Amino acid sequence: MEKKTIVLGVIGSDCHAVGNKILDHSFTAAGFNVVNIGVLSPQEDFINAAIETKADAILVSSLYGQGEIDCKGLRQKCDEAGLEGILLYVGGNIVVGKQHWPDVEKRFKDMGYDRVYAPGTPPEVGIADLKEDLNIK
């Protein structure tokens, strides 16, 4: 079976590179073709990389607490760019302060994200979810 391609990056003005490298290594080891666009990435970079590589999913990371601002509108931009239905995952420290997680998760799902991960979620959880969502046995 052909490897599934994912675009991975850290959105907005966030420069947290260590978690990005861990995710890159973990998803690569799990058999995915990872296109890592790095840190400080605007939404357009995720979209352009997904189009260029015919990606199956976009994985957005944010650790500096501003993810809610940075992630708003990405689903709509994906749809406008012809990426309707592409899987969108987001995770990390995606909001400012301690907030009730079910509320945070709902807000991101309402923005069009398929999966939303709390701080400290192990990469293996996202890998298992992605395999399920892409029907990989």
From Swiss-Prot:
Keywords: Cobalamin, Cobalt, Isomerase, Metal-binding. It comes from Clostridium tetani (strain Massachusetts / E88). The gene is glmS. Heterotetramer composed of 2 epsilon subunits (GlmE) and 2 sigma subunits (GlmS). GlmE exists as a homodimer and GlmS as a monomer. SUPFAM superfamilies: Cobalamin (vitamin B12)-binding domain. Catalyzes the carbon skeleton rearrangement of L-glutamate to L-threo-3-methylaspartate ((2S,3S)-3-methylaspartate). One of its GO terms (molecular function) is cobalamin binding. InterPro entries: Cobalamin-bd (IPR006158), Cobalamin-bd_sf (IPR036724), GlmS (IPR006394). This is Glutamate mutase sigma subunit. Pathway: Amino-acid degradation; L-glutamate degradation via mesaconate pathway; acetate and pyruvate from L-glutamate: step 1/4.
